[in-house]
Amino acid sequence: MGILESISNQKAATRRVLRARRDNLDAVLCASHSAAVLTHLFQLPELNAAEVIFCFISTGTEVSTHGVIDRLRALGRIVLVPKILPGEPMRAVPFTGWDNLTQGVLGIPAPLESVAYPSYVDLVITPGLGFSPTGTRIGFGRGYYDRWFATLEHGLRVGIAYECQLEKYLPTETSDVPMHIVITEQR
């Protein structure tokens, strides 16, 4: 077995463990932990100074970002969300409201609009199955975020997750882009 195949197998096994941990949290705990993450997130000076913020739209047992998106919009910020089209890189598309979403690729809610935002992003709120305290991220295995990060000239990358999704070590490849900051309900 080659090194890359070994890393790929390690990542697949790690994803299974981390997904199971997250999915074993009950709805009440997910809601309270998500509220705590939101509180920590809005204590970031970089978020409060940001004008253009990219934020994933949470699904299932992920840390809920619905309150984050609503609060940012209420503050007058430009909120961008992911849009994935078959065979194309992920795009950052303006969020125009919960009523303007459709079921996108991979079952993830996405804007009806497909035109990418033409400018910079100040801060990126990033999903993941797991993170290390130093910012290493393991996503869902399709590479959309890592490839998109490679196109960004700047922008603070902030990973959000539950504390149970943190691991001291995560298997990585050279294409994996780390976070600048990782926020959980405890930190």
Can you describe what each PLM-predicted range is?
Residues G2-S119:
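N-terminal active-site beta-alpha-beta segment that forms phosphate/nucleotide-binding
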